[in-house]
Amino acid sequence: IIAQYLVKPGSTVIMNYHFTTSKAHVTRLGGKVEELVIDEGLKVSSTCPFKGNIDLNKVKACVEKEGAENIAYLRLEAGTNLIGGQPISYANMKEATEYAKSLGIPTILDASLLQDNLYFIKTREESMKDKSIREITRMIADLFDIIYFSARKFGFGRGGGILVRDDSMYTEMEDYITMFEGFLTYGGMS
């Protein structure tokens, strides 16, 4: 639903790392994905505490090459499922989203593995050690235009959700729900 709403043929989605279906939806619509996780993220023996961080220099180079108007959105995954759930730091999320927003690029968080990522932020990021998990969660939520999650992770159950900051985004995305999930009036299940 998110890709259907934001991706246009020839547009680019910037990600720290893809998830299979997220990438498939983008490419199905004629967009392309740029995976810009830090180099340490793909080194098995690395002791980097946040191997899911996005490389901000690569992000800036990508935006410069493609043009901000051709970036459909910045998608960050906390943690990066396909490379072992590697966490992303709060500081990295903040810097990446501030940069994207300064150029009018929508910011999206895949929060399907957020609970583990929150633990790593609290225990590995010095500036977050005295914050509660609730406080960190709120701080992260404030960074993004859209947050979505799959509730299937960690055995929570079937389903998921999309949270949007902007009412007009909600209204426009609502039109796509019947094509993929069924009508809102019966819980979005077809």
Whereabouts are the PLM-identified features?
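Conserved PLP-enzyme active-site core in the AAT-like
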Residues: 1-190
